[in-house]
A protein has these predicted regions:
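Extreme N-terminal, non-catalytic leader segments
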Residues: 2-41, 214-223
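Short gly/ser/thr-rich secondary-structure transition/capping motifs
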Residues: 25-28, 130-135, 181-184
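Conserved P-loop
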Residues: 40-142, 223-272
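Structural motif
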Residues: 44, 148-150, 182, 226
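Short His-Asn-centered micro-motif
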Residues: 47, 152, 184-186, 229
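General beta-strand structural signal in soluble alpha/beta enzymes
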Residues: 108-110, 151, 183
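Short beta-strands and strand-loop turn motifs
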Residues: 149-154, 260-262
């Protein structure tokens, strides 16, 4: 993910005096050169709306692209809390394909169980799995091996009281220079938001004529989704959605094909 807001740069057709007109540049270049971007930020995606984990997957895709196209030292850890192996996700097959093709660029760890539970229903297994995941995260952060560490669904783990918030805040605050950390999930604690360089809240705005229940809405496939607002994570959410669709095409042997059409992105600073 670009951690620096890209800005539009208009360059009109120019003319040389005494000679035929020639095109200097056409269009709008919005991509910030990778050398100008600020790395090492803490990003938090929370809120009731969809797109939090999708945005993290988009960051994964972009970071892998950075390692491929620019041959920079980059490696991603995708650490997923509350998403144990007992449940499959659309993006699983796509991530496995990326791991097979570029094993030096991405590692994935899944912890916990996939079932929904409240703080009162938490078991010793839930606590031990949260601790296992956090121990891996702390080791990864201390090692400085990774350029990006994604802590998917860490916010709900903290909300459930499965980990020490003080320990998490202390560890994330002391991360190595240049290491980007992405934290996702609902109910981000204020003390974590306070130390973040970026906090995007996802809110759902559903069409008024949809009469289906919210649970059924979550299970719908197809349709139109629009990501808008001042916060970052819109394009990365769309990229994450594309990665999920590719995963479905691989695992379910269906004719899934994705078209990624990007406007106002004619520069060379995009790595996805």
């Amino acid at each position: 993910m670009e951690s620096k807001q890209a800005s539009g740069n208009h360059e009109d057709v120019s003319k040389d005096k005494g000679s035929a007109s020639r095109t200097k540049a056409i269009g709008i270049v919005t991509a910030a050169d990778s050398r100008e971007r600020r790395y090492g930020q803490l990003h938090i995606y929370d809120g009731e709306g969809k797109g939090k984990s999708q945005a993290a997957l988009g960051v994964v895709l972009r970071t892998i692209g950075l390692g491929i196209c620019e041959k920079k030292r980059t490696r991603v850890l995708l650490l997923r809390f509350l998403k144990g192996p007992g449940r499959s996700y659309d993006e699983d097959a796509a991530i496995e394909a990326l791991q097979q093709g570029f094993p030096h660029l991405i590692d994935q760890v899944r912890t916990g169980r996939a079932d929904f539970f409240t703080a009162e229903q938490a078991t010793k297994f839930d606590i031990s799995e949260a601790k296992r995941g956090w121990d891996i995260a702390k080791g990864a952060i201390a090692s400085a091996l990774y350029s990006v560490v994604v802590l998917d669904e860490l916010n709900p783990v903290l909300d459930l009281g499965l980990l020490s918030l003080d320990d998490v805040v202390k560890t994330l605050r002391s991360r190595p220079d240049g290491m980007e950390i992405i934290v996702t999930g609902r109910a981000a604690p204020p003390s974590l938001i306070k130390i973040a360089e970026l906090h995007s809240e996802m809110r759902a705005h559903r069409a008024l004529d949809i009469k289906d229940s919210s649970q059924n809405l979550l299970n719908l496939s197809g349709g139109i989704e629009i990501y808008t607002g001042e916060g970052k994570g819109k394009s990365t959410s769309a990229l994450g959605k594309a990665l999920q669709a590719i995963g479905r095409g691989i695992s379910q042997d269906k004719s899934h094909r994705v078209l990624i059409l990007q406007w106002l992105k004619g520069g060379s600073g995009y790595t996805e």
